[in-house]
Amino acid sequence: IKGTPRFAKVEDELMVLQHHAPIYETLEGSKSVDPDIAWLGEKLRAWQVTTVYPVAMQLLKPGVSADDRKLLCRLIYSYLVRRALCGLPAKNLNKVFQSIAQVFATGPTTPMALKEFFAARPGTSSKFPSDAEFTLGILSQPAYTLAQGNRIKDVLWELELASRSKFAEAGPMPGNLWVEHVLPDSWNADWPFDDGEIIQRFSGDPRATNR
């Protein structure tokens, strides 16, 4: 009820704050009470998304297994990346994560609960892009403008990690990396095709694909 105090006593509120403080510090990178929460915090800092925090705070509550926590962290990260690279709006994400936090607060905190949440919300403002939609977004959207700065660097680093074999040396992302977009957006005038005809890349013309 609006206006009703959430806690009967100040002591109760302080206990909740004390419980969540280490998790918050882990998300902010100043402490590490769990490796998966620390990993998620690093990703959220790169993507500058703090609206996930109410959800992340619940991933260490009693009853959440380590496997479920790890998968939930990966799913949250995947959700952010997929939406960004598909060109979907981010303005409603605060409401989305508030709703997820409410689902986890009143029910099981599991990957299945998260899957059911998104299955019931296929709209553009909240949908979890499918593999097919994500692939289309990667192939048709300018990722370097949709995920600028640290975001595209983070995506490329994850691709680098995924391409390594299990024998590759593990290590954190170097701090001095940067991304250079060396291909021009409009290049036909300076580098014309041999036949002189200009075909738009996403026009559907098979000759554009062949080139």
Question: Which residues does each PLM region occupy?
Answer:
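A cross-family structural signal marking well-folded subdomains
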Residues: 1-158
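Histidine-centered nuclease catalytic patch
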Residues: 170-211
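A general structural signal for short secondary-structure junctions and capping/turn motifs
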Residues: 2, 6-7, 44-47, 167-174, ...
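Alpha-helix capping/termination and helix-coil
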Residues: 60, 80, 163, 183-191
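Short cysteine-rich loop/turn motifs with clustered Cys
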Residues: 154-176
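Generic alpha-helix signal with a bias toward terminal, lower-confidence helices
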Residues: 59, 88, 92, 168, ...
